[in-house]
From Swiss-Prot:
One of its GO terms (cellular component) is cytosolic large ribosomal subunit. This is Large ribosomal subunit protein uL14. GO terms for molecular function: large ribosomal subunit rRNA binding; structural constituent of ribosome. It comes from Oleidesulfovibrio alaskensis (strain ATCC BAA-1058 / DSM 17464 / G20) (Desulfovibrio alaskensis). The lineage of its organism: Bacteria, Pseudomonadati, Thermodesulfobacteriota, Desulfovibrionia, Desulfovibrionales. Transmembrane segments: none annotated. One of its GO terms (biological process) is translation.
Length: 122
């Protein structure tokens, strides 16, 4: 469950390390985002000479949440951290690698590029 001001790690090699959610997309009253949802983020920490700079405002898709997700078979999955992958204007990942596992729910949301780059899909 990600809301405005939530801090997330960046799970790609775009150069950003930490981001903060500044808006949850999908309706004016929408408060929370879960795995597979698109949010607007501000880069809070970035590596020097990288594709993104501190202060950049971008869209990102949530790939891991510390809050558990209930699946249709009744099982739950949760991760240790909140993490997101930065997206460009066309909705494609900015980075060329994904770090750490991602949730299977991304496949249902048609983020095939992220699923194929991820080392593990849980």
């Amino acid at each position: 469950m990600i809301q405005v001001e939530s801090a997330l790690q960046v799970a790609d090699n775009s150069g950003a390390k930490k981001v903060a959610c500044i808006k949850v997309l999908g309706g004016s009253k929408r408060r929370y985002a879960s795995v597979g949802d698109v949010i607007v983020v501000s880069v809070k920490e970035a590596l020097p000479h990288s594709k993104v700079k501190k202060g950049d405002v971008m869209k990102a898709v949530v790939v891991r949440t510390a809050k558990e997700i209930r699946r249709n078979d009744g099982s739950y999955i949760k991760f240790d951290t909140n993490a997101a992958v930065l997206l460009n204007k066309q909705g494609e990942p900015v980075g060329t690698r994904i770090f750490g596992p991602v949730a299977r729910e991304l496949r249902a949301r048609n983020y095939m590029k992220i699923v194929s780059l991820a080392p593990e899909v849980l």
